[in-house]
């Protein structure tokens, strides 16, 4: 299900990238990348939760580093880069101009209990040809992430402790860098934003506001 009520040029991922200090250049596509927990049959799993049991930031950083080393790093014909965020909330950038944001992705928090097979990224009807390649690449990354994450020591420790594990990557909110005037350019005003949420801070960045960061704030 595409995000409802969100303008095509202002998708969550590119706004979060601005907050995280990750530059998105023209032609690149950014996506939110969740670490999610699965349940049920390995051949036909369902989403157990969208947050890997609210995995810690320290654990998640280890996992995303491993994912970028094995599956990303900006290498290959259809490159991807993975950037660690907070807890289960991370970012993927598809550089090189090959990708399209015209892909329907399902937000995991809206689809807890849903079958993975019914929710995988697909190109939009009548989308540009690059959309099909983008959707296929995202599906491939999801599939390849599962054995990699399953074998990681972080998940072994969580499994032994009876905690939900980070079983898969999950992509949503694809978009390109927006073009928007700052509040000063449009109205001649300045201001600041205080938030623990990257989405809100990213809006502040694009609006030209001072972003005030509070140490230890996570938004959880």
Per-range role (PLM):
Residues 38-42, 95-97, 174:
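Generic structural motif
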């Amino acid at each position: 299900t595409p995000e409802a009520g969100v303008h095509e040029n202002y998708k969550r991922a590119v706004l979060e990238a601005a907050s995280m200090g990750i530059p998105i250049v023209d032609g690149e596509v950014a996506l939110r990348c969740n670490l999610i927990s699965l349940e049920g049959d390995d051949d036909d799993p369902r989403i157990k939760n969208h947050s890997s049991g609210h995995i810690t930031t320290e654990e998640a950083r280890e996992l995303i580093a491993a994912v970028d080393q094995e599956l990303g790093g900006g290498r290959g014909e259809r490159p991807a880069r993975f950037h660690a965020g907070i807890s289960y909330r991370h970012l993927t950038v598809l550089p090189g101009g090959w990708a399209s944001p015209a892909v329907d992705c399902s937000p995991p928090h809206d689809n807890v209990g849903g079958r993975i097979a019914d929710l995988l990224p697909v190109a939009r009807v009548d989308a540009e040809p690059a959309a099909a390649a983008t959707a296929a690449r995202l599906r491939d990354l999801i599939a390849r992430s599962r054995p990699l994450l399953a074998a990681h020591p972080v998940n072994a420790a969580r499994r032994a402790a009876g905690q939900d594990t980070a079983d898969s990557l999950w992509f949503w909110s694809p978009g390109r860098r927006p073009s928007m005037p700052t509040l000063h350019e449009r109205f001649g005003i300045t201001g600041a934003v205080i938030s623990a949420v990257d989405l809100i801070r990213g809006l502040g960045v694009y609006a030209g506001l001072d972003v005030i960061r509070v140490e230890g704030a996570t938004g959880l």
